C-alpha cells in the first residue's frame, strides 16, 4: 500500500468513527425519528459505503500486485530452466565415471605396492633397496602416500 492510499484509508476510518459517534449522539438526544438523526445516519452509512469500496479496491489491487509478482517469478523460473543443457548431465556422468575409474586404479596400485612391501620388507623400509626397480617402487609408494586422499 502506497503512503497516499494509506493516508486516505486512515482518513476514511477516522471519518467513519466520527460520523457513527455523532449519529449515536444525535439519536440519543433527538430520537431516531428526527430528521437530523436521519441525515446523520445516512451520512454515516455513506462514509461506511466509501470505506467498504476503498477496502474492496485495495483488495483487488493487492491481488493484481500478487499476480504480477507471481508472473514475474514464474517467468524467471522459466528463463532459468530454458538455459538448462541436458548435455551437461551427460558430461557430468562421464566425468564421474572417469574419476571413479582413476580412483580404483590408484587404490589398486597403492594396495599392490603396500602388499609387495609387506611381503618382502615386513612392512617397513629401513635401508635403500638394492636394485633399481625396488628403489623406483619405494619412491612411487612415498609419492602416493604424500598425495591427497580422494573420498570414495
From Swiss-Prot:
Organism in which the protein naturally occurs: Alcelaphine herpesvirus 1 (strain C500)
Coiled coil ranges: 86-120
Name of the protein described by the UniProt record: Gene 35 protein
Family: Belongs to the herpesviridae UL96 family.
Entry keywords, A to Z: Coiled coil
Gene designation per UniProt: 35
Domain of life (superkingdom): Viruses
Pfam families associated with the record: DUF848 (PF05852)
Amino acid at each position: 500500500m502506497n503512503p497516499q492510499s494509506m493516508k486516505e484509508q486512515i482518513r476514511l476510518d477516522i471519518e467513519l468513527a466520527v460520523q457513527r459517534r455523532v449519529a449515536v449522539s444525535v439519536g440519543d438526544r433527538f430520537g431516531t425519528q428526527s430528521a437530523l438523526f436521519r441525515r446523520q445516519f445516512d451520512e454515516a452509512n455513506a462514509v461506511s459505503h466509501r470505506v467498504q469500496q476503498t477496502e474492496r479496491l485495495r483488495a483487488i489491487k493487492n491481488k493484481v500486485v500478487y499476480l504480477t509478482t507471481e508472473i514475474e517469478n514464474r517467468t524467471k523460473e522459466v528463463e532459468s530452466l530454458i538455459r538448462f543443457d541436458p548435455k551437461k548431465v551427460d558430461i557430468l556422468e562421464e566425468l564421474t565415471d572417469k574419476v571413479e575409474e582413476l580412483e580404483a586404479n590408484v587404490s589398486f596400485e597403492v594396495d599392490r605396492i603396500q602388499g609387495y612391501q609387506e611381503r618382502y620388507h615386513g612392512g617397513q623400509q629401513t635401508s635403500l633397496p638394492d636394485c633399481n626397480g625396488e628403489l623406483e617402487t619405494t619412491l612411487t609408494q612415498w609419492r602416493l602416500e604424500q598425495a591427497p586422499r580422494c573420498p570414495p
